[in-house]
Amino acid sequence: LLPVLQAEFGTLYLDEIDAAHLAMFYSKLRQTRKQSLYCCPKGFSIIMTDHGFTRNSLRTKAGVAESVITSAIRGQNIRPYSAEKIVSALGLPLSEVFCEISSEQYLDANTVLHYHRVMSSILQTAVTWGYIPDNPAHIVATPRKSNKPIKYLQPEDVIALIETMDRDHVPAKYRLALLALVLTGMRREELLATRWMDIDFTKGTLEVVQAVGYIRQKGLQIYDTKTTGSYRVISLPDCLLSEFKSYREYKDKQLEPIGLSVQDSDYLFQEADGHLLWPSSVTSWVRKFYSRHPELQRITPHGLRHTNASIQLNNHTPLPAVSETLGHTNSQTTAAIYAHVIQSAKVAASRQVDSILAPYLKNR
């Protein structure tokens, strides 16, 4: 987002950004093609080894996720900034390694709406700080959001997922990550930035204080959720607290032979070398796991967050409580995203009332 916003508004003072400018910007976005992608048709693994790299050493030098290197080896598409970092590490021109694949698709409505929300948030902060008198984004016609239905699992699908992971003896960190996502409703980036000190085992809570994000040219960065409105304290179910305790004991046993132990400042989820686990690594692992189990209902890590919300709403958890758990800025956001789930819950509640009172009314 940042490069696009800087190109459009970077030379303007805040009070020069008006509603007309914002409307024109959204119109341009709707006519913008999605970013082109790159692939390597020549056998990337040969290029890599010819230049003295292993998969891991190239990943480290280029500063990209392991899944990116895997995609390049398989001839799959990768993003431009990843391709640029890889060829920089190899010391080769971009055109010698990758071919550009132009996109024929335009930015969708949800992407344009996301730009609007970011600009509105920036301008509202400027109002709060007294730089401008009012927020011009409030009077611009809001880009319409696509009504594409969200995907989530039913409770029985969640149970099947857990049972299959246990039968497969999947890596402990990925098993716990998926359990935590579905039991807390956290965003993937928030969970991967969680430290042991953020969990209060006495109170049974988890404080969401930071998240991990990728910044071009800088790699993975940690940012404070208090600046994004996503800070919150989540109550943890007993079963997840138990899983966290078991995982910490497991990590302690791993470190014991070298005279170390888990520290409160450590992240829960780390690579073998101690670095932060890349968010894309979790998504890549989930994709591979489901490819081995076509019998399961497929879901993404973000879909597990939707699953948590749907379970709460279908069990009549008040909307403000669900919104707070998810870290939404207000209940309206939650209601808009989960409108279909809320409507289904209302129908179920109506039928429940009917099942209780109907026999009496019919016998009058």
Stretches found by the model and what they are:
Residues 83-96, 100, 164, 216-223, ...:
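DNA/chromatin major-groove-contacting recognition/catalytic segments
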Residues 73-77, 152, 211-214, 326-352:
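Catalytic-site neighborhood detector that most strongly recognizes the C-terminal catalytic loop/helix
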Residues 32-51, 78-84, 102-115, 128, ...:
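Basic, Lys/Arg- and aromatic-enriched nucleic-acid-binding interface segment
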Residues 203, 214-231, 235-240, 246, ...:
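C-terminal secondary-structure termini that scaffold catalytic or DNA-interacting sites
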Residues 34, 60-64, 105, 163-174, ...:
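Short, basic (Lys/Arg/His-rich) helix/loop patches that form interaction surfaces
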Residues 1-127, 139-142, 265-266, 283, ...:
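Short, Lys/Arg-enriched alpha-helical recognition elements, typified by the DNA-recognition helix
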Residues 60-64, 74-75, 91-92, 193-199, ...:
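A short, basic/aromatic helix-end/turn motif that makes direct DNA contacts
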Residues 18, 111, 115-118, 154, ...:
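Hydrophobic (often cysteine-bearing) scaffold residues that line and stabilize catalytic clefts
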